[in-house]
C-alpha cells in the first residue's frame, strides 16, 4: 500500500490426532513489526518451546499428571491470523510419545465425572474423593464457637508520630541486620498484625500492607486498577485512563503494553502508592462476565504475554504489580461463594496457563487470589494452588494476598500460602488459632517474611 503500518505475525501448530483430544490449531507465538514505510520490510523471530503446545494428561492416557507430546506429525504455520495462514512452514514427525514434565495431581475436581469428546460422546473422568457434607465445616475452617472481632491498634490521642524504640526495618535495608535477625524480635502479636490489610492514607482507597511503626515498617498503599490508577475522587487528583486490557491485547504489541505499564507506574509512584493492583488476567470464558474489560483475552498465551509485559513495565519503575485473580474468577454474580468446577487438564492448559507465563517471565511482586471456590475449596485457602503449583512448580518468589474481604477464615489462608488478608485481617482469631495449635508459628513467620521482602524491594 501507500501508507506506513505495522504487521502482526502469528505462529500456529496443528498437532496430530492421537489418543488425547487436542485443538485442531493452537497459537504458540506471535510478533509485531515496527512501523514500516511502504516497501520496507523487517525480519521477525518467533521462538517457543515444545512445552507451549504440550497436552496435560489428567486421565493417564499416556502418563498421568504429566505434560506430554503424542507421537505423530506436528505442522507449524505462519500467518496474520488463524484463518489466514500460509502453507505449512515446517513439519516435524515425532516417532514416540515424549514426557516433558512429570507433575502430580493438583486441584482435581470432585464433581466432574465426564468429559465430552469431539464426536459428542463422553469419557469418564477420575475425580478426587468427594468431601462428605458433615466435613464441610471443618474443611472451610469455620470457627467452632464465638465471634472474633477485628482488633485495631491503640491510638495515642494528639500524637502524630511515635519515636522509634525498636530496631528499624531500614537497618535491614542498609545491611546492618539480616531479615532473619530482625524478625526474631517480633512477637506473635506483631506478626499477626502484619498479615492483615492496613488503613488508607493519602489518596489511596484500597488499603495498605505493613504498618508496624515501632519497628519502622511503613504502611505501603495499594490502588486499583487495570485501566489506570484509581484514587479517592474527593482528592481532586486526576490520573490517566489507559485503554482497557482487552483493547491492549488487540494490538498484539507487548512493547506498547510495557510502556503503558511504566507510564502508569510513574503516576502510582508520584501519588505515594507502592503496589498497583494490576494486571488482571482471567480468561474471557463468557461475554457475560462483568470484568471482561479488565481481562486480556480468551487465549491464555495472549493473556500471559500481555500480562508479563505489563508487569515488567510496572516494576521497572520500582512499583509492585499484583497479578490477579488467581484463579478461575470468571463471573461476578455471587463471586465470593460461586464454585468454579473444572477438570485439571482445562485448569492447567487454559485457566492457569496465562498466570504461569506471567510468573515465569516477569515475577510480579504480588499475586492476588480470587474470591471464588475452585473445585469445592476457596482459592484463598487452596494450598495446592497457592503453594504447590504457584511456588513449587512455577517458582513464584513473591507475596500472595486475598481479594478484598474473602469469606475463608484467615488462619486457613495463611496455612495455604496466602500471606496477607485484605482489606483487613482478623488478628484476634488468627492469634487464637496459633495458640490452639491450628496454625503454626512457622507458617506465620514465612508469610511475614514474604511481606517484608516485598516491601524492601519497592523504590
Task: Indicate residue ranges for each PLM-predicted region.
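Short beta-strand elements
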Residues: 84-107
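Glycoside hydrolase catalytic-domain context in secreted enzymes
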Residues: 1-84, 105-459
Amino acid at each position: 500500500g501507500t501508507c506506513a503500518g505495522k504487521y502482526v505475525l502469528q505462529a500456529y501448530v496443528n498437532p496430530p490426532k492421537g489418543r488425547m483430544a487436542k485443538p485442531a490449531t493452537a497459537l504458540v507465538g506471535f510478533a509485531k513489526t515496527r512501523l514500516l514505510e511502504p516497501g520496507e520490510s523487517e525480519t521477525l523471530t518467533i521462538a517457543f518451546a515444545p512445552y507451549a503446545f504440550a497436552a496435560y494428561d489428567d486421565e493417564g492416557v499416556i502418563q498421568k499428571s504429566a505434560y506430554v507430546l503424542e507421537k505423530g506429525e506436528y505442522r507449524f504455520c505462519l500467518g496474520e491470523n488463524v484463518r489466514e495462514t500460509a502453507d505449512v512452514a515446517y513439519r516435524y514427525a515425532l516417532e514416540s510419545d515424549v514426557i516433558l514434565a512429570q507433575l502430580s495431581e493438583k486441584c482435581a475436581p470432585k464433581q466432574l465425572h465426564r468429559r465430552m469428546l469431539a464426536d459428542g460422546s463422553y469419557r469418564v473422568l477420575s475425580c478426587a474423593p468427594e468431601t462428605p457434607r458433615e466435613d464441610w465445616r471443618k474443611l472451610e475452617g469455620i470457627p467452632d464457637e464465638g465471634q472474633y472481632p477485628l482488633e485495631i491498634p491503640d491510638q495515642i490521642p494528639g500524637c502524630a508520630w511515635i519515636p522509634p524504640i525498636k530496631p528499624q526495618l531500614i537497618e535491614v535495608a542498609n545491611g546492618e541486620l539480616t531479615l532473619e535477625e530482625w524478625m526474631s524480635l517480633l512477637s506473635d502479636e506483631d506478626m499477626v498484625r502484619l498479615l492483615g490489610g492496613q488503613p488508607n492514607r493519602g489518596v489511596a482507597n484500597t488499603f495498605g500492607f505493613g504498618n508496624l511503626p515501632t519497628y519502622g515498617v511503613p504502611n505501603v498503599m495499594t490502588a486499583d486498577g487495570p485501566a489506570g490508577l484509581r484514587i479517592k475522587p474527593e482528592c481532586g487528583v486526576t490520573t490517566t485512563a489507559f485503554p482497557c486490557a482487552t483493547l491492549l491485547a488487540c494490538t498484539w504489541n507487548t512493547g506498547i503494553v510495557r510502556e503503558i505499564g511504566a507510564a502508569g507506574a510513574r503516576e502510582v509512584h508520584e501519588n505515594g502508592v507502592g503496589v498497583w493492583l494490576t494486571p488482571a488476567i482471567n480468561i474471557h470464558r463468557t461475554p457475560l462476565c462483568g470484568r471482561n474489560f479488565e481481562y486480556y483475552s480468551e487465549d491464555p498465551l495472549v493473556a500471559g504475554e500481555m500480562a508479563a509485559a505489563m508487569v515488567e513495565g510496572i516494576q521497572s519503575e520500582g512499583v509492585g504489580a499484583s497479578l490477579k485473580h488467581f484463579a478461575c474468577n470468571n463471573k461476578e454474580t455471587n463471586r465470593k461463594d460461586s464454585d468454579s468446577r473444572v477438570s485439571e487438564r482445562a485448569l492447567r492448559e487454559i485457566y492457569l496457563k496465562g498466570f504461569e507465563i506471567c510468573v515465569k517471565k516477569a515475577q510480579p511482586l504480588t499475586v492476588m487470589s480470587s474470591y471464588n471456590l475452585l473445585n469445592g475449596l476457596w482459592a484463598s485457602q487452596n494450598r495446592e494452588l497457592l503453594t504447590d503449583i504457584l511456588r513449587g512448580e512455577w517458582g513464584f518468589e513473591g507475596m500472595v494476598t486475598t481479594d478484598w474481604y474473602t469469606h475463608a477464615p484467615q488462619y486457613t489462608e495463611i496455612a495455604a500460602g496466602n500471606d496477607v488478608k485484605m482489606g483487613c485481617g482478623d488478628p484476634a482469631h488468627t492469634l487464637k488459632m496459633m495458640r490452639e495449635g491450628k496454625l503454626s508459628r512457622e507458617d506465620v513467620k514465612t508469610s511475614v517474611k514474604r511481606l517484608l521482602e516485598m516491601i524492601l524491594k519497592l523504590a
